[in-house]
């Protein structure tokens, strides 16, 4: 994730009820730090989303274990609700598989966000539990997908550190 992309991400504002996903107030320098787990999804030079992996993909409150690689992300707000989530998340998972070779992926999604839950279920994720975040008290769903064989694709070319 470049500094310019990170500066863009921290301005993204989603409509209610998805505004809990806003990154306003986040430090763009942290997102752009090569040591962080944040990566930009770029299409023809334009930032369309981001994906985070490891600790940066977690919500505080779930039991931390290494049975799966945590991943989170976001799509540019004006692109949400247009059926792009599956391709964006799928591309991110391909990238994560190539880069990290995890035994499984784990996503944590706000319980109210049924739209995102449907998308990840279509990508093979299954429920692993529910918890309340320690920082906000919000309810979250945890879904896991066992690792599959690496696919062939150009996902690595679309992701930028």
Regions found by a protein language model. Name each.
Residues 1-9:
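A short beta-loop-alpha structural element at the N-terminal edge
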Residues 86, 111-129:
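Conserved active-site alpha-helix within GNAT-family acetyltransferase domains
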Residues 79, 83-91:
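Conserved acetyl-CoA pyrophosphate-binding loop and the N-cap/start of the following alpha-helix
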Residues 98-109:
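Conserved GNAT acetyl-CoA-binding A-motif
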Residues 108, 124-141:
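Conserved catalytic-core motifs of GNAT/GCN5-like acyltransferases
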Residues 11-78, 95, 99, 146-148, ...:
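Acetyl-CoA-dependent GNAT
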Residues 70, 104, 115:
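Amphipathic alpha-helical recognition patches that constitute DNA-binding helices
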């Amino acid at each position: 994730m470049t500094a310019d992309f990170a500066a863009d991400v921290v301005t993204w504002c989603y409509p209610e009820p998805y505004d809990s996903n806003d990154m306003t107030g986040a430090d763009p320098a942290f997102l752009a730090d090569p040591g962080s787990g944040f990566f930009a999804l770029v299409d023809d030079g334009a930032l369309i989303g981001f994906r985070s992996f490891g600790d940066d993909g977690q919500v505080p409150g779930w039991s931390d274990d290494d049975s799966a690689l945590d991943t989170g992300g976001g799509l540019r707000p004006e692109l949400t609700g247009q059926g792009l989530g599956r391709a964006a998340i799928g591309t991110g998972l391909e990238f994560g598989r190539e880069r990290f070779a995890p035994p499984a992926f784990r996503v944590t999604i706000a319980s109210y966000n049924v739209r995102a839950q449907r998308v990840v279920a279509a990508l093979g994720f299954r429920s692993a539990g529910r918890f309340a975040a320690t920082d906000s008290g919000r309810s979250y769903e945890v879904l896991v997908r066992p690792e599959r064989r690496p696919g062939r694709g150009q996902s690595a070319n679309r992701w930028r550190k």
